[in-house]
Amino acid sequence: LGPDGKRGRQTYTRYQTLELEKEFHFNRYLTRRRAVEIAHALCLTERQIKIWFQNRRMKWKKEHKDESQAPTAVPEDAVPSVSTAADKADEEEEEEEEEEEEEEE
């Protein structure tokens, strides 16, 4: 901990970064079980994995910001996706945590 009570910035090895990026390529969101597996495999904490993914999603969002503003054609026979209240709660919790992490940096 530094004089301000915050932890220092985590640096990841090339191997850890490569593995995290590889996982992110296939899934932008992790299940808790998968986060535990990755944390164990990379000798990191679940919290470090969670925060890395939150930060990486924000980076991805910024990189793809322009793409999402372009009008997209939706086929007339497209079926709207169905999300449960639990999914919505999880998404809101993730967004709140991302905002908290950004404030900490």
UniProtKB/Swiss-Prot annotation:
Q: Please provide, alphabetically and separated by semicolons, the GO molecular function terms listed in this UniProt record.
A: DNA binding; DNA-binding transcription activator activity, RNA polymerase II-specific; DNA-binding transcription factor activity; DNA-binding transcription factor binding; RNA polymerase II cis-regulatory region sequence-specific DNA binding; sequence-specific DNA binding; sequence-specific double-stranded DNA binding
Spans through the membrane: none
A biological process from GO: embryonic skeletal system morphogenesis
Instruction: Give residue spans, biased composition: Acidic residues.
Output: 89-105
Highest taxon listed in the record's lineage: Eukaryota
Tell whether rRNA-binding is among the UniProt keywords: no
Q: What is this protein called?
A: Homeobox protein Hox-A7
Q: Which residues bind DNA?
A: 5-64
Protein's UniProt keywords contain Endoplasmic reticulum? no
Any one GO CC term of this protein is: nucleus
Q: Where in the cell is it found?
A: Nucleus
Q: Coding gene?
A: Hoxa7
Organism expressing this protein natively: Rattus norvegicus
Upper lineage is: Eukaryota, Metazoa, Chordata, Craniata, Vertebrata
| Function description | Sequence-specific transcription factor which is part of a developmental regulatory system that provides cells with specific positional identities on the anterior-posterior axis.
Q: Which SMART domains match?
A: HOX (SM00389)
